[in-house]
């Protein structure tokens, strides 16, 4: 089973991004857009900007943590 690190982009606020990890990317995006995720509910609809698949759960969470760091945010804005 893969773990997906994903980046969402708000269609409502073009400066708003969200980074997360899930095993079911389609279901998680549906929850974000239905307003069922408290952290993202104010900025729906969300569009999937990109995702990366990891076979190792710890690597996925480590990469998510990196993307949420200042250097990771700079990396994602420049490269993704």
Go through each PLM region and give its residues:
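GIY-YIG nuclease catalytic motif and its immediate N-terminal context
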Residues: 1-38, 44-47, 51, 55-73, ...
């Amino acid at each position: 089973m893969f773990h997906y690190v994903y980046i969402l982009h708000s269609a409502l606020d073009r400066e708003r991004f969200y980074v997360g990890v899930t095993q079911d990317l389609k279901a998680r995006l549906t929850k974000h857009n239905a307003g069922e995720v408290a952290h993202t509910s104010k900025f729906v609809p969300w569009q999937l900007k990109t995702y990366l698949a990891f076979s190792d759960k710890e690597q996925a969470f480590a990469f998510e943590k990196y993307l949420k760091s200042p250097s990771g945010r700079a990396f994602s804005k420049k490269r993704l």
